[in-house]
């Protein structure tokens, strides 16, 4: 007894097309979501790298803080080895003399480096001079360290283990003309970065020596 082959009915075709469309939509949505997740993950990884790089550079600066005052660009006075402003609107907020400036190519320049930190337009920026005693015409090498920053606060621990909001402390500010006073270093530096996405990040750097 023979049987006849029959084709799909219109209803069956519509159901099959609907199922195929649904599977395509689900597959596309999954791929699209995976791509979004991948982009978000990369963004988070880039942000983490930015934060870690910022912290590492600040650590290298403060750990290698040297007691080396510099001449003022104008006049005969000197600036302290470390000058930290208590006014958060003052620029630069911190400037310091540091050692350990690597010179792999053997360029004729000092092994010490004068570094300054600026906070402008929600960005923490690091600048350094190529000479230790800059003049007005001296230029700096600039690098944005961290973006999306709401505020930056520095504190400095003195030998009595008391935190100061400026450096040199107000107790020695009247003796700023003495070169020995300008060499005074804290035993530790605390930085607080209030960021838009990670909240407050606090690090304490112990000053060597």
At which residue positions do the language-model features occur?
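Short, mixed charged/polar active-site loops
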Residues: 112-114, 140-142, 199-202
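A generic structural micro-feature
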Residues: 88, 107-111, 141-146, 181-185
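Periplasmic/lumenal scaffold domains of single-pass inner-membrane subunits
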Residues: 124-127, 132, 142-144, 150, ...
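Extracytoplasmic beta-strand-rich oligomerization domains located immediately C-terminal to a leader/signal peptide
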Residues: 27-135
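A short, polar/proline- and glycine-enriched secondary-structure boundary/capping micro-motif
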Residues: 106, 134-143, 165
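Short linear sequence signals and composition-biased patches located at protein termini or domain-edge surfaces
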Residues: 151-209
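N-terminal single-pass transmembrane signal-anchor helix
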Residues: 1-31
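Structured surface patches comprising rigid loops and adjacent beta-strands/short helices at the edges
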Residues: 68-71, 144-156
């Amino acid at each position: 007894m023979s049987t006849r082959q029959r084709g799909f009915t219109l209803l069956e075709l519509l159901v099959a097309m609907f199922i195929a469309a649904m599977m395509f939509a689900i597959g596309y949505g999954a791929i699209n979501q995976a791509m979004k997740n991948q982009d978000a993950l990369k963004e988070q990884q880039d942000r983490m790298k930015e934060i870690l790089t910022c912290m590492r550079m600040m650590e290298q600066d403060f750990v290698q803080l040297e007691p080396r005052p510099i001449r003022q660009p104008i006049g005969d006075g000197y600036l302290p080895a470390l000058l930290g402003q208590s006014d958060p609107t003052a620029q630069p907020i911190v400037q310091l003399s540091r050692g350990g400036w690597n010179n792999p190519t053997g360029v004729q320049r000092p092994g010490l480096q004068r570094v300054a930190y600026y906070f402008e337009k929600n960005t923490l920026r690091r600048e350094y001079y190529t000479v230790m005693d800059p003049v007005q015409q001296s230029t700096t090498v600039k690098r944005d360290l961290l973006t999306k920053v709401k505020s930056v606060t520095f504190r400095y621990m003195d030998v009595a283990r008391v935190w100061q909001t400026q450096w040199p402390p107000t107790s020695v500010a009247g003796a700023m003309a003495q070169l020995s006073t300008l060499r005074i270093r804290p035993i530790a530096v605390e930085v607080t970065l209030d960021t838009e996405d990670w909240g407050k990040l606090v690090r304490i750097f112990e000053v060597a020596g």
